[in-house]
Design a protein with these regions (language model features):
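Flexible loop linkers connecting adjacent transmembrane helices
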Residues: 60-78, 103-109, 312-324, 349-365, ...
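Hydrophobic alpha-helical transmembrane segments in multi-pass integral membrane proteins
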Residues: 158-166, 218-226, 304-311, 383-384, ...
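Structural signature of hydrophobic alpha-helical transmembrane segments
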Residues: 41-53, 110-122, 170-183, 235-236, ...
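Alpha-helical transmembrane segments
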Residues: 128, 132-138, 163, 188-202, ...
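Signature of multi-pass transmembrane helix bundles
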Residues: 1-57, 72-73, 171, 184, ...
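Helix-loop-helix junctions within the multi-pass membrane cores of secondary transporters/permeases
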Residues: 80-151, 329-410
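Transmembrane helix-loop boundary segments of multi-pass membrane transporters
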Residues: 39-40, 58, 105-117, 134-150, ...
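Small-residue-rich segments of transmembrane alpha-helices in multi-pass membrane proteins
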Residues: 19-23, 51, 79-87, 147-158, ...
């Protein structure tokens, strides 16, 4: 167990370290910071690393077995209505505990946290149920995505522009480190039982469809809900002078975040207990392992949220405002690209997906191939986000052609690539995006006097758009390469046949 925890902490370190080093360099060059502020950031980074380590291990021990167990059990039932209701309930409950969603909700001033969280959670629940039905009835994923995104862009014509970027951001943050292991395991469980051939293709696409639900629900919220007049206010960093002041800031925030986490995790734990009582699916040892996993998840989430809200997010905001307020404001673009490149390389949820992709495709799509494609795509996405912050370009002019290209590419690649690509979009926009890149954009937008809701929000959405395009381009190249290899083999066989005939004549 200790070795696994060390491994998870190392993964978290590789995720947080690049950002930490970039901030340290900027703090002594373009954006000087007070020592106390830097101490808050570094302490927050440590809590983030340890918290994500505990959290990933806990999710692996609890969420993944729960998802796979529920998936296999449901798939054996013949009652479709029961399957739909259980998938909806579980999708909703699991999403409420997603830390990325809580981070986003704290930054949307005009919508109460509970309203936004429940709206998004219901969206995930509805589309998880639809995604399970897709597997059961073997409906094409590409057709489902085409219909879903067509509906989304019709709704954008009626929803207020203030909700557009927030809606697509919500779609990106909900599929994070707590929901991805559960949703993918649920898909594997259902497809393994219900499909006889090609179930590996079926197991992908759940994350992609679950990312659509929150976007749809928030756009509907914009049409029917009248938000408050609360305006975004810049995050203020508490004045800290001594190390005691630093410790005090984290100690003050700890109880509130502990309460949030416990309230979020308890329903999931209750579902696990109820599932065990009804099915007796787990043996005693598995049950103990799952219980320890929930404990690790709680510890990790508390450390994660405390580190993010007290030390990490405020410094991202400060850095953005400092860069935008300087004479070198355009440096935001290359710095954003650099951060985007390294963020996705070690995003926890991405690593979960990459490993499962490599296993399912038998190594055809390796982890290194996935990482390279995602890193380049996300770097370009963050560059566009920073251009939006500096110029005020509407996100609509990027999202529409971007998703149109992704859906067109889906016609020319194998179905497994479609599922992988759109799943990657949901998981690439993970903790580091919502906790650092979004505050960075918000700080820069505030310093420039822009509209935070329309210009800064949307970073997560563009990061989520990059993988569907990048990976499907990789899929097109893979198809052409496979055809070339097949043709070469055919030519060789043909040549061998001619030689054999000549030998026979001699």
């Amino acid at each position: 167990m200790n070795e696994k925890l060390k491994e998870k902490v190392k993964e978290s370190l590789s995720s947080v370290l690049p950002i930490t080093l970039i901030v340290l360099v900027l703090s002594v060059t373009l954006v000087p910071m007070e020592i106390g502020t830097l101490a808050l950031f570094l302490t927050g980074a440590v809590l983030l690393i340890v918290g994500m380590g505990f959290f990933q291990l806990g999710a692996e021990m609890s969420m993944t077995p729960l998802g796979e167990g529920v998936g296999k059990t449901l798939a054996k039932r013949e009652k479709v209505l029961l399957i739909v209701l259980v998938a909806f309930a579980l999708g909703t409950i699991i999403t409420i505990a997603e830390p990325d969603l809580q981070v986003l909700a704290n930054q949307v001033a005009s919508i109460p946290n509970s309203v936004l969280i429940w709206t998004v959670a219901v969206g995930v629940g509805v589309f998880l149920a639809l995604a399970v039905l897709r597997i059961l009835f073997r409906v094409s994923l590409a057709k489902c995505l085409l219909g879903a995104y067509a509906l989304l862009f019709v709704l954008t014509l009626f929803s207020p522009k203030e909700f557009l970027a927030v809606a697509f951001d919500a779609g990106g943050v909900t599929t994070g480190p707590i929901t991805v292991p559960f949703i993918m395991a649920l898909g594997v469980g259902v497809s393994a039982i219900r499909s006889t051939q090609g179930h590996d293709d079926d197991s992908f696409g759940l994350v992609a469809l679950c990312s659509v639900g929150p976007i749809l629900m928030v756009l509907l919220l914009g049409i029917f809900y009248h938000p408050t007049d609360a305006a975004y206010s810049a995050v203020e960093i508490a004045p800290v002078i001594t190390t005691r002041d630093v410790a005090q800031q984290f100690a003050l925030g700890f109880p509130g975040y502990a309460e949030e986490v416990l309230l979020s995790i308890l329903p999931i734990a209750a579902v696990c207990v109820l599932f065990q009582l009804l099915t007796r699916y787990y043996r005693r040892r598995q049950l103990l392992r799952t219980g320890v996993g929930f404990l690790y998840t709680v510890i990790g989430l508390i450390l994660f949220l405390t580190g993010v809200n007290v030390g990490f997010t405020p410094v991202g905001n400060l850095l953005g405002s400092g860069l935008a307020g300087s004479a070198y404001r355009w440096v935001l673009i290359p710095i954003g690209a650099l951060i985007g490149y390294y963020i996705v390389k070690a995003e926890p949820a991405v690593q979960v997906l990459n490993k499962q992709v490599e296993d399912v495709t038998g190594g055809t799509v390796s982890q290194s191939m996935m990482n390279t494609a995602l890193s380049i795509g996300v770097a370009c996405a963050v560059m566009l986000s920073m251009v939006r912050v500096l110029t005020g370009i509407s996100i609509y002019w990027i999202l529409v052609p971007g998703y149109a290209l992704a859906l067109i590419l889906a016609r020319y690649v194998p179905s497994v690539f479609v599922g992988i690509a759109f799943d990657s979009g949901g998981v690439a926009s993970g903790p580091m995006t919502s906790t650092f890149l979004l505050p960075l954009a918000m700080g820069a937008c505030t310093a420039l006097g822009g509209n935070v809701v329309t210009d800064a929000f949307g970073v997560v959405a563009l990061v989520a758009l990059a993988p569907p395009v990048a990976i499907q381009i990789m899929g097109v190249l893979y198809v052409h390469k496979s055809k070339a290899v097949a043709q070469n083999k055919a030519d060789l066989l043909s040549d061998d046949g001619v030689i054999d005939l000549e030998d026979e004549e001699i």
